[in-house]
Amino acid sequence: MKFVALALTLLLALGSQANLFQADAPTQLEHYKAAALVYLNQVKDQAEKALDNLDGTDYEQYKLQLSESLTKLQEYAQTTSQALTPYAETISTQLMENTKQLRERVMTDVEDLRSKLEPHRAELYTALQKHIDEYREKLEPVFQEYSALNRQNAEQLRAKLEPLMDDIRKAFESNIEETKSKVVPMVEAVRTKLTERLEDLRTMAAPYAEEYKEQLVKAVEEAREKIAPHTQDLQTRMEPYMENVRTTFAQMYETIAKAIQA
């Protein structure tokens, strides 16, 4: 309706300036008036299409009143536009006076129709909100129960596994130390035995040191070279065993730790 009032205002303004436009550019004046009338026709057509979408007997009277008001408004605008040029000021005033009540009636009908439709829109929104709230009330306890059960199960599993993890960690450390305590003495014993044999050999060779110094030194070095590989071989053979034990316990610990965190 604001656009309808704008079109009427344009017609009035063009009418009040008719003499000036006729003196300067009469074709431009006619173009503006024709455009305003075309716009009023479009407004009437669009309003009638909108009214057709209102169903029910409650709105029939409003549809009829509003349609009649738009038709009369269009007729007034058409008649006044044709008479504006020779009688600009008189017809402009007459148009405003003659259409005042009609324009007020149109605005009243539109506001009345809006007030009739507003409760239905509010009722629809209220009904939808009610259904949403009902669904939320029904689903929320289920979600809460499911979430609580998951948390409870996770806490129970964690409570059961934590002592087990501590035992495994302690057992792992204990097994490593136990294995080391058994293997290291064996290596040390072999090393001690070999060292003793070398010392015995050196003691036995001492009296002949000066006489057979060069030969004895050479013999001792040869003996050392022969014994050293056996010592290194023993250590090499034991190292994979130690590493295998360490890797096995580490993998076991990591697997259980991941299961708890999951």
Curated annotation (Swiss-Prot):
GO molecular function: cholesterol transfer activity; phosphatidylcholine-sterol O-acyltransferase activator activity; phospholipid binding; protein homodimerization activity
Example of a GO biological process term: phospholipid efflux
One term under GO cellular component: extracellular vesicle
Main location: secreted
Subcellular location as annotated: Secreted
Signal peptide range: 1-18
Function comment: Participates in the reverse transport of cholesterol from tissues to the liver for excretion by promoting cholesterol efflux from tissues and by acting as a cofactor for the lecithin cholesterol acyltransferase (LCAT).
Subunit structure: Homodimer. Interacts with naxe and yjefn3.
Protein name: Apolipoprotein A-Ia
Organism encoding this protein: Danio rerio
Taxonomic path: Eukaryota, Metazoa, Chordata, Craniata, Vertebrata
